[in-house]
């Protein structure tokens, strides 16, 4: 009788950014994000499954389950294979279940759309996007193989296994002491009625990126600054009078690969907080843009990002904290997360311009991205001439979203809006 030898089990420690997610994961905040690619034609499930099978070989760290140790969480390699299925549950539903050994990502489809959902402890948006683009490469070149029989396009994410596995927080940690304490100022907190089953409400706006860039340039600023200011104004318009004493603070994730060399497929991001106090500043858009622009200039520097990275990494390098049991670390991280949340109103995440090999572009209509949310969030990305801005919110109310898109429409921007009203799950 032939016996097949199992691969040896491999263990990987969570990177610094990943450690906050497991103790703070629950039904109200699943810590899951989604990438969507809408194709020109209906998705073929069998070809998509083949593409996933090829892709996972190139990203072995994603073929892991999350385990609890005495002192730390860790990833354990698994023989489980991802199974492609038609979309069957609400967006960004739970992927990490403490008592289950399951993969931490999922590939689903619906009509012309392919969805990649990933648990944030596994990777950030940039890392997951490398996986997603590789998956799309295999899918498109297989489904339309007659179009590529003379020559295959280049795969534009060719990092080695070691580079994809890299813990870039550890690599770039300098040990620099950050003595100044970070004070959390209470921010305005958006309230609302949640759906009974914590279903995420997603509203997607598709528009011409050139129109938004032209608007931003009219105000002598960038697309991100312009849309951040617009989001703040949309929130301000719904603030109760008694709450206007608190600043509006938007948390903005930053891809650290832009500032520190890395092509890791894992987490390597930081966050900056952009604050605007309407009691001390005017509420017209020009004034908000000016204030937001100054905040970005002040916060988005290599020096500040390095200090923030060192401050967060210091915990795991602390000799005492290394021997503290995991259940105490979990309590500390939950407490820290609650304190941090008091200083944040909402989140805005700009993935930026998504590119693929020029030979693949004709088969793709658009990309989209959004996160699970404890509060309203914006996720946005562009592909070709199209910018997609997605609001994800745990609340039934949509007044902030309406304010935001209405202001863009009043500026002459043509917007196609859809919502996640289709019932799944």
Model-derived features with residue positions:
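Acyl-thioester-dependent acyl-group transfer interface
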Residues: 1-71, 79-106, 237-425
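Acyl activation and transfer enzymes in specialized metabolism, enriched
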Residues: 40-56, 117-133, 204-240, 389-391, ...
């Amino acid at each position: 009788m032939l016996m097949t030898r199992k691969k040896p089990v491999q263990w990987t420690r969570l990177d610094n950014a990943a450690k906050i997610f497991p103790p703070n994961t629950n039904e109200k905040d699943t810590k899951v994000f989604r990438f969507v690619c809408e194709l020109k034609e209906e998705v073929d499930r069998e070809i998509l499954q083949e593409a996933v099978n090829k892709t996972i070989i190139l990203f072995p760290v994603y073929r892991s389950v999350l385990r609890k140790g005495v002192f730390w969480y860790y990833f354990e390699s698994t023989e489980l294979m991802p199974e492609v299925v038609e979309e069957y549950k609400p967006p960004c539903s739970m992927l990490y279940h403490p008592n289950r050994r399951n993969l931490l990502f999922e590939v689903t489809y619906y009509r012309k759309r392919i969805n990649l959902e990933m648990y944030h402890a596994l990777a950030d948006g940039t890392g997951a996007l490398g996986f997603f683009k590789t998956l799309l490469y295999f899918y498109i070149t297989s489904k339309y193989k007659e179009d590529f029989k003379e020559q295959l396009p280049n795969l534009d994410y060719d990092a080695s296994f070691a580079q994809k596995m890299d813990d870039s927080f550890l690599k770039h940690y300098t040990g620099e002491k950050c003595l100044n304490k970070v004070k959390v100022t209470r921010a305005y907190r958006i309230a609302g009625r949640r759906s009974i089953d914590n279903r995420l409400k997603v509203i997607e706006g598709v528009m011409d990126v050139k129109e938004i860039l032209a608007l931003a340039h009219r105000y002598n600023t960038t697309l991100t600054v312009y849309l951040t200011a617009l989001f703040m104004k949309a929130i301000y318009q719904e603030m109760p009078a008694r709450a206007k004493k608190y600043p509006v603070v938007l948390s903005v994730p930053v891809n650290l690969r832009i500032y520190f060399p890395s092509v890791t497929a894992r987490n390597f991001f930081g966050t900056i907080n952009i604050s605007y106090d309407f009691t001390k500043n005017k509420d017209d858009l020009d004034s908000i843009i000016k204030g937001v622009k100054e905040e970005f200039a002040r916060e988005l520097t290599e020096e500040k990002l390095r200090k923030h990275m060192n401050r967060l990494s210091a915990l795991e390098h602390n000799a005492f904290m290394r021997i503290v049991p995991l259940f105490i670390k979990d309590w500390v991280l939950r407490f820290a997360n609650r304190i941090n949340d008091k200083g944040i109103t909402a989140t805005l995440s700009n993935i930026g311009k998504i590119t693929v090999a020029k030979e693949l572009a004709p088969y793709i209509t658009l990309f989209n991205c959004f996160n699970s949310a404890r509060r309203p969030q914006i996720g946005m990305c562009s592909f070709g001439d199209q910018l997609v801005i997605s609001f994800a919110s745990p609340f039934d109310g949509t007044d902030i979203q309406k304010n935001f898109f209405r202001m863009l429409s009043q500026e002459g921007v043509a917007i196609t809006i859809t919502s996640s009203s289709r019932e799944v799950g």
